[in-house]
């Protein structure tokens, strides 16, 4: 969907509503799909509400793939990440889920109490952290704290969080606010979604969007700052 042109259906001083219509068969997926995204800012909180309908059963597991750079300094080494996940989906050598759900205890994926990120190839993160077995009411699930003291608290209704370290970022064609393109390990991505791989593993949460049962996701990012030093 990131390569599609969305329409602005509505907008105001603190919000925008985007819509997208995907015809049956586009991308190899069945169903005419109507998707709506609402982004709204209230004080220091950005909230995304995603809804979708389909006139035929179809796989549907969207995720916001924003990269989060909270510092004025390059890279994200030394930033602290905390994630409320007790388990993760084991990936194989091709990064596909094996179907095994493993505890994060004594693994590189235990972020429950917070850990500093290296932000380089000494670490590797591209996997799903399990926040639960089903959707839930909006609740805090992750916190990223930058070296300059900027904090981002992420909340979501989703049952999974894909953590990606940004090791293959190639932004040569996309100049940034600073004028220089982003490269590998410029920033991590925290992607709220259902567990990837559910079509191959029946014990994973269901991601089929069915007629009469609209999809709905709420994810928010709240920012604050603390004194460093």
Predicted regions and their residues:
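An exposed, glycine/acidic-rich loop-and-rim segment of catalytic or binding clefts
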Residues: 1-229
């Amino acid at each position: 969907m990131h390569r599609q042109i969305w329409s602005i259906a509505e907008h105001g001083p603190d919000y925008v509503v985007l819509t997208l219509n995907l015809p049956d068969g586009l991308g190899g997926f069945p169903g005419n799909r109507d998707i709506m995204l609402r982004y709204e800012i209230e004080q220091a909180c950005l909230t995304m509400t995603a809804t979708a309908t389909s006139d035929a059963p179809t796989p549907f597991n969207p995720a916001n793939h924003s990269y989060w750079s909270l510092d004025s300094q390059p890279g994200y080494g030394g930033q602290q990440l905390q994630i409320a996940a007790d388990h993760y989906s084991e990936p194989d050598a091709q990064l596909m889920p094996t179907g095994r759900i493993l505890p994060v205890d004594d693994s590189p994926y235990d972020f429950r109490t917070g850990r500093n990120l290296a932000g380089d190839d000494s670490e590797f993160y591209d996997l799903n952290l399990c926040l639960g077995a089903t959707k839930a009411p909006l609740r805090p699930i992750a916190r990223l704290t930058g070296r300059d003291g900027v904090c981002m608290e992420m909340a979501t209704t989703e049952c999974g969080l894909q953590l990606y370290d940004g090791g293959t970022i190639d932004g040569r064609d996309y100049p940034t606010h600073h004028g220089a393109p982003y490269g590998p390990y410029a920033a991590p991505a925290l992607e709220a979604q259902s567990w990837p791989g559910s079509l191959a593993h029946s014990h994973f949460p269901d991601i089929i969007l069915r007629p009469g049962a609209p999809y709905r996701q709420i994810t928010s990012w709240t920012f604050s700052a603390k004194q460093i030093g």
